[in-house]
Amino acid sequence: MGLKGRLFRAATRMLFHSHAMNVVNRCANGYELSADGSAVVFPYVRKRRGRNLQILIYHRVNDEGDQFFPGIPTGVFARQMEYLASDWNVLSLEEALERVKQKDVPDNAMAITFDDGYRDNFLQAFPILKKLSLPVTIFLATGVIGTGRMLWHDRVFSAFRETRIPFLEGIPNESDHHDLQTIESKLTAQGKVLRFIWSLGEDDRTRWIDWLVTKLQVPGHQDASKTMLTWDEIRLMHRQGVSFGAHTVTHPILSKLSSHRAVEELQQSKAAIEHELQAPVRTFAYPIGRREDYNEDTKRFVREAGYACALTTVPGTNTDTANPFELRRATPWDEDIAAFAFRLNLMKWSS
């Protein structure tokens, strides 16, 4: 961590353990502190800003220390959830959406989501969420649930993690070969490869990843049965209040697909979850989820498939005027709880 990062952590810890965090929180909610420290409400601030819904996005919670696809350490996740339970109004995604629709978003509104369907969501995150009675929605890429297959990006992560070759040549738009002799150099090459893959259509993506796995001299197929959730685990969590949404079948970038294939991915993932849980699925999250990964046609296909909303990975919060098919989410990068708390309050204030 550089000097800037250390200074940020020191400053946020000081704020977190002082009265100043309350100032940030009250200002974000449309309050101003009077001289004696009491809160004075300014309704015009609320009217101008509205009340924001924040949605957090997680993928993995574990203590593996995998630098190629890092998860949130279990202890850090527990502290984050304890903070949310004590200081925020954590709603189920379904309730949060209804409150947005009714323009009745409460103060400090928060929803918690996970993408993809990793097994550590059940083994590590679920016990913490259950203990704290916090609602959560998990978006499933159904093609890898209970199949032993890996998501395409996990194939890339695994290939770079396991390869022992000293360098890689052949990355399009890259003139030089890439050193792979250190973790840092592998991560640099992995980042460039992912950016290239994101630009490809579905068939080209599959062919190129197959080429990459062969080039890096790692097994072409790896069993992911211990990595992804099973339907039995999903049903157990569902019976205990966890909500599940769709995240397509194969985790493609929808804007790169033909209309027919995009509709297939949306309909089939929804149908698979509804069949397994015998319950309607109304929520969806775009794979990758950047602005360029969906478009107006995509949003229309999502709506016509019967979903009530779609979540992006575009950073930010959501007001009661937000487009339900373009909801923003925040990624909780900060492992330091003071920085985590400060950043959430700052986002609420700055939105």
List PLM regions with ranges.
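Short secondary-structure transition/capping segments
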Residues: S133-G146, Q181-R195, E292-R300, T321-I337
